[in-house]
């Protein structure tokens, strides 16, 4: 996984899996490599301008495909050839509160498959939209740099909002 974290979004290896140029809006707001995304809480990722839940979901799928290049299990599940049950309810119990879930925690879930990834992301996203961290009128952060500054301020005792 460590090698995957260092893959840059402008590298040929990334472009092989990112056929729809999912990384472009991420690059525009300051993301440079996979590690930049994976280290964030999902709630923070969804609070960055131009990163809506669809783009975030597509990014998680691209990273998942880097981590799991063999797609046979996912294709088998999709085609009802393989039955691999995943309990979102059990996962959610282990992860409470959902506001603290990071992208890394989702991607490193035991027995993760593409369907489970989407179910987990949908659940965390639903929790985000019900939370106090969501504001339908504005994003908290205009770019990754602003988010990092806010995180440093939060560690210093402020409320975590960008100044």
Task: Describe each PLM feature range.
Residues 1-136, 140-154:
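Compact, charge-rich alpha-helical regulatory domains located at protein termini
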